[in-house]
């Protein structure tokens, strides 16, 4: 039943987003690299990419499955290098959804990406891990408390000159906080279930609106600079107080 509801909602949201905010392209505003969530691939992100292209962003959607965070980070490295080569001098924004936000942050932190990426926008990101990853065959390293997650979150979560943004719904299962400087956009209104919110984020007009703000360096929420080590995995989970709801 839930799968059918999500598919129906996805189709409706795609239809809405497909007509939202798309007109004549504006002058070149930089490069956007979109990194999908687990299992999704590129297709659900194409309407979002089309909307950004119409607003003047040279947008690339990566076709990654999110099964291996470090491997995906190396793919992101290659994609960003290619985008910079194709658009010399243009700022690069890296936008990751769900586990795609983790592979994007691994790239920024471990592969030198923070030296070349101007802004990082995480959508529905389990930055300190997700219980849903525990015991699954795909990217089990995203389970809270694994050595991988401990290493990813050791020291400064927001290194370099990159600016860091977080987008999530009111009932997201993980609040997406990072220590160091981060803009936390005001959580958008829930559809009624955090899991549904999370799955549909790539095609929700509310997410597009907040992404526009982030790409324009407008912190439509709260800028927070938490000290290193102030965040624990448990403190990031179920900020609405409704587990898995």
What are these regions (language model features)?
Residues 27-36, 43, 51-64, 70-157:
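Serine-dependent carboxylesterase/thioesterase catalytic core
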Residues 109-245:
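Helical cap/lid subdomain of alpha/beta-hydrolase-fold lipid enzymes
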């Amino acid at each position: 039943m839930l799968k059918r509801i999500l598919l129906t909602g996805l189709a409706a949201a795609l239809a809405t987003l497909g007509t939202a905010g798309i007109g004549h392209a504006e002058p070149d505003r930089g490069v956007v690299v979109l990194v999908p969530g687990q299992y999704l691939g590129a297709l659900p992100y194409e309407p979002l990419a089309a909307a950004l292209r119409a607003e003047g962003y040279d947008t690339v959607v990566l076709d990654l499955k999110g099964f291996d965070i470090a491997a995906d980070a190396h793919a992101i490295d290659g994609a960003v290098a290619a985008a910079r080569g194709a658009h010399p001098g243009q700022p690069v924004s890296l936008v990751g959804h769900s586990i795609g936000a983790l592979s994007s942050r691994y790239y920024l932190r471990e592969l030198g990406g923070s030296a070349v990426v101007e802004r990082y926008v995480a959508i529905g990101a389990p930055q300190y891990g997700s219980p849903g990853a525990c015991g699954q065959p795909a990217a089990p390293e995203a389970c809270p408390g694994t050595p991988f997650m401990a290493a990813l979150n050791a020291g400064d979560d927001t290194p370099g000159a990159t600016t860091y943004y977080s987008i999530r719904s009111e009932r997201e299962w993980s609040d997406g906080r990072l220590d160091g400087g981060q803009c936390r956009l005001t959580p958008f209104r829930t559809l009624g279930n955090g899991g549904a919110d999370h799955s549909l984020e790539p095609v929700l007009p509310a997410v597009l609106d907040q992404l526009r703000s982030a790409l324009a360096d407008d912190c439509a929420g709260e800028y927070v600079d938490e000290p290193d080590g102030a965040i624990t995995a448990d403190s990031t989970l179920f900020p609405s107080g409704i587990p898995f709801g």
